[in-house]
Each structure stands twice: as structure tokens, then as C-alpha cells.
From Swiss-Prot:
One of its GO terms (cellular component) is cytosolic large ribosomal subunit. Disulfide bonds: none annotated. Residues 1-49, 101-121 are annotated as: Disordered. The gene is RLP7. Keywords: Nucleus, Ribosome biogenesis, RNA-binding. This is Ribosome biogenesis protein RLP7. One of its GO terms (molecular function) is RNA binding. It holds the Pfam family Ribosomal_L30. Its main location: nucleus. Residues 19-40 have a biased composition (Basic and acidic residues). Belongs to the universal ribosomal protein uL30 family. GO terms for biological process: maturation of LSU-rRNA from tricistronic rRNA transcript (SSU-rRNA, 5.8S rRNA, LSU-rRNA). The keyword Nucleus applies. Residues 110-121 have a biased composition (Acidic residues).
Length: 318
């Protein structure tokens, strides 16, 4: 049996005094934390910036603005059907995947797609194909852009539309003729690929989050999606009553694809390499070298959109 509460006035006063002291200590800690944050903001604002840093940032940002302007002008000419002075009116996709151990690229098509400098065995297969406009499922991951670049307003607006403002977040999108130019605009800041059903299921079961307002809450809050009742309440009118239905709609590009994807918040993924130790630094160098091979940034307006093996990347970040 539970013991009755102690109603001794001395005990109650002591508890109240301890509670008041704890509350005051928390308020003092919160005040100190706020002062520390303001101090850090002031120090960052007044931080000395070297001239070469300003020059590098300016030049890199100007190059990025030039690339975006070229892509925009090319797409405007395509819309106006003015194809007389453009290099190509076709859209290309460059698929980069790791070569299986023991296999060699000996076919003529593979040899044509590989540049001379890449003919040294780097363990990658590059396949350049023409995008025919058929809808396909892509998973897009937001990554760090080129060094010293301030993201131009047009590219940032596209990233906001895709809900990819934060680094290491990902969303499912349907690739169409209208979406392709948007991916070209933000290609230096994203990594894309076609996910398998296993990757889709793994992401949704492990990383799915939604905004949900409980009866006792004043505002919607971010929660983990692990209840089929919530899915049925929000998407039941569309015939989606459980998490498995969401997985099916996304993997098959069903009629309710957009409603299911916008019902889910962007997936927050782990960093591929974290830490400041010697091994972490070595892994960061390896990752940087690998990114140079797979994330080839080009300023040409007709540069292809690069697709990578997104399943292996999801397995590392999930």
C-alpha cells in the first residue's frame, strides 16, 4: 500500500523553498545562456574578415550567379521554342555508380561516356542518357555547396520550394519535365538518385516526422510518425490508412504522392562523417576526394543532372 503524503508544515515549507530555489537557479542559467549567445553573436558580427576571404567569396558567388543565369536563359529559349542558337535542346542525366569488383567497362557506349582523364580506373561507371520526360521517383539530399559561395536568391528560393533549407535533409520528389530545370538550378547543393523500395521503407519507418496537434496542445508540434490512427485521420479520405500505404504511394508514384510527401516533414539524416579526431579527419579527406569524382560541378547551361547510387548513401546516413 502507498504511504500517505506527509502534510507536516515544515516539510511542505522545505519543499516549497527547494522548488523556489531550483526555479531561480534555472532562470539564472537561462539568463546566462542568453547573454552568452548574444555575446557570441556580437563577436561574430565584429569578427575581422581577411581581404582574400572577401575576394574568394565574391568571385565564387559571381561564378554561381553566372551559371544560374545561363541555365535560366537556356530554359527561357526552350519555352519560347527559339532553338536556333542553343547548344542542345535535350536534357541529359549522368548516372554515376560504383563498379563491381572484377568488372571492367569494355562496351563501346561506356567507353564513349568516360572521359580521357577518367579512363584511369577510379572504380566508377559513368552513363550519360537523354531524359525523355517520363516521371520517375527521386530522393534528393541537401548537401554543402561549393566552397565560399553565398547561395543566390533564385537557388535559395528553389531549395525552399523543395523544403531543403537545412543541410543533411532529404525529400522524395517526382522528376518531370517541369522539375528538371529546378534541379539544374540547385545541382551544386543537392545529391539525387533513384531509391529502392527497401530504402524508402527504411527511411519512412526510421526517420518519418510530421506536424501534429494534440487536443491539449495550443499549436502543432513535431512528432515521430509511428501511429496508423494519425495516418488514417489525416489521409483516410484519400484511401491511405497506414504507414505501409504511404510507402506504396511514394514507391509507385500514386495519385496521392504529393499529399503523402507533404504530409511528411523532410527527413533529417545523420552526417556522413562526424568528430574531430584523427580518424574522422582522414575519413573527411576520403569523402572530399570521393565527392570530387561524383559531384562534378559545371558552369555550362547544358550540363547534365548527376544521379548517384542513392541507396548506398541512404544506408550511410540513415
Amino acid at each position: 500500500m502507498s504511504q500517505p503524503l506527509n502534510s507536516n508544515p515544515e516539510v511542505l515549507l522545505r519543499k516549497r523553498r527547494n522548488a523556489d530555489r531550483t526555479r531561480l537557479e534555472k532562470q539564472e542559467l537561462a539568463k546566462k545562456r542568453k547573454e552568452q549567445e548574444e555575446k557570441q553573436k556580437r563577436s561574430k558580427k565584429n569578427r575581422f574578415v581577411r581581404a582574400e576571404t572577401i575576394v574568394a567569396t565574391t568571385l565564387a558567388t559571381e561564378r554561381e550567379k553566372t551559371r544560374i543565369r545561363r541555365v535560366r536563359d537556356l530554359e527561357n529559349q526552350k519555352v519560347k521554342n527559339d532553338l536556333s542558337h542553343i547548344p542542345s535542346d535535350r536534357d541529359f542525366i549522368l548516372r554515376i555508380s560504383e563498379r563491381e569488383a572484377g568488372s571492367k567497362a569494355t562496351s563501346e557506349s561506356e567507353l564513349q561516356d568516360v572521359d580521357e582523364e577518367d579512363e584511369e580506373d577510379d572504380g566508377l561507371i559513368r552513363e550519360k542518357i537523354v531524359y525523355d520526360g517520363e516521371p520517375s521517383l527521386l530522393f534528393v539530399i541537401r548537401v554543402k555547396g561549393p566552397t565560399a559561395v553565398k547561395i543566390p536568391a533564385k537557388a535559395y528560393k528553389v531549395l525552399s520550394l523543395l523544403r531543403l533549407v537545412e543541410l543533411n535533409t532529404g525529400v522524395f520528389i517526382k522528376l518531370t519535365k517541369d522539375v528538371y530545370p529546378l534541379l539544374k538550378l540547385v545541382s551544386p547543393y543537392i545529391v539525387i538518385g533513384q531509391p529502392s523500395l527497401a530504402s524508402i521503407r527504411s527511411l519512412i519507418q526510421k526517420r518519418s516526422r510530421i506536424m501534429w496537434q494534440r487536443p491539449e496542445d495550443k499549436e502543432p508540434k513535431e512528432i515521430i510518425l509511428n501511429d496508423n490512427n494519425i495516418v488514417e485521420e489525416k489521409l483516410g479520405d484519400e484511401g491511405v490508412i497506414c504507414i505501409e500505404d504511404i510507402i506504396h504511394e511514394i514507391s509507385t508514384l500514386g495519385e496521392n504522392f504529393s499529399k503523402c510527401t507533404f504530409f511528411l516533414l523532410p527527413f533529417k539524416l545523420n552526417r556522413e562523417v562526424s568528430g574531430f579526431g584523427a580518424i574522422s579527419r582522414l575519413n573527411k579527406l576520403k569523402m572530399r576526394e570521393q565527392n570530387k569524382k561524383t559531384r562534378q560541378i559545371s558552369n555550362a547551361a547544358t550540363a547534365p543532372v548527376i544521379q548517384v547510387d542513392i541507396d548506398s548513401m541512404i544506408s550511410k546516413l540513415n
